[in-house]
């Protein structure tokens, strides 16, 4: 509908980063490169523990109100996310085999203090996708774009400039 023919650069955070990685495996001709922040390749105990804490915060604090600034249907957004991650059947979710198919350049960014995943997530990308550049940010939690915006923007701009191929 938009008439966009050029392969796109995908920039995703958290579950959105995982979706970007999956798009690059399914439609490689549509993806020129990826910048992923705090992606999930597999489920870790720390992820589940902190998503349980998020549920408690949603029920007992003003988290629902805060999230309402970003979501029209905050309950649907929160509970859809929370329930899938806490479903015991989801514990086996793993996209590592799919990620190994990626051939586009990848910049993978993770906060060293990420409460929803360890550095094993982005290191797993580097083990599977040749040429992946890692940016592990100290004093940074799950939202590098919020916690260290200057570092994220500088790294992303430099990476895209180094790998962008004009149409």
Language-model features and meaning:
Residues 1:
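Alpha/beta-hydrolase active-site loop
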Residues 6-44:
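Conserved hydrolase catalytic core segment
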Residues 40-51, 116:
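A short beta-to-alpha transition loop/helix N-cap that caps and shapes the active-site region
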Residues 47-72:
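A catalytic-pocket lid/entrance helix-loop region that shapes and gates access to the active site
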Residues 81-98:
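Active-site nucleophile elbow and catalytic-triad environment of alpha/beta-hydrolase enzymes
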Residues 102, 108-110, 114:
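Short beta-strand/loop motif that positions the catalytic acidic residue
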Residues 115-121:
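Conserved alpha/beta-hydrolase "acid-adjacent" motif
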Residues 132-133, 138-167:
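Catalytic active-site module of serine/aspartate enzymes centered on a nucleophile-bearing elbow/loop
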């Amino acid at each position: 509908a938009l008439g966009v023919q050029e392969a796109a650069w995908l920039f995703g955070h958290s579950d959105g980063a995982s979706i970007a990685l999956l798009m690059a495996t399914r439609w490689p001709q549509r993806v020129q490169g990826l910048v992923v922040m705090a992606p999930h390749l597999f489920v870790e105990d720390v992820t589940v523990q902190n998503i349980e804490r998020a549920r408690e915060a949603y029920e007992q604090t003003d988290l629902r109100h805060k999230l309402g600034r970003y979501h029209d249907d905050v309950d649907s957004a929160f509970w859809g996310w929370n329930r899938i991650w806490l479903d015991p059947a989801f514990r086996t979710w793993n996209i590592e085999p799919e990620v190994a198919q990626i051939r586009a350049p990848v910049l993978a960014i993770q906060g060293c203090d990420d409460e929803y995943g360890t550095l094993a997530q982005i290191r797993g990308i580097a083990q599977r996708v040749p040429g992946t550049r890692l940016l592990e940010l100290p004093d940074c939690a799950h939202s590098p774009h919020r916690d260290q915006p200057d570092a994220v923007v500088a790294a992303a701009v430099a990476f895209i400039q180094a790998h962008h191929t004009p149409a």
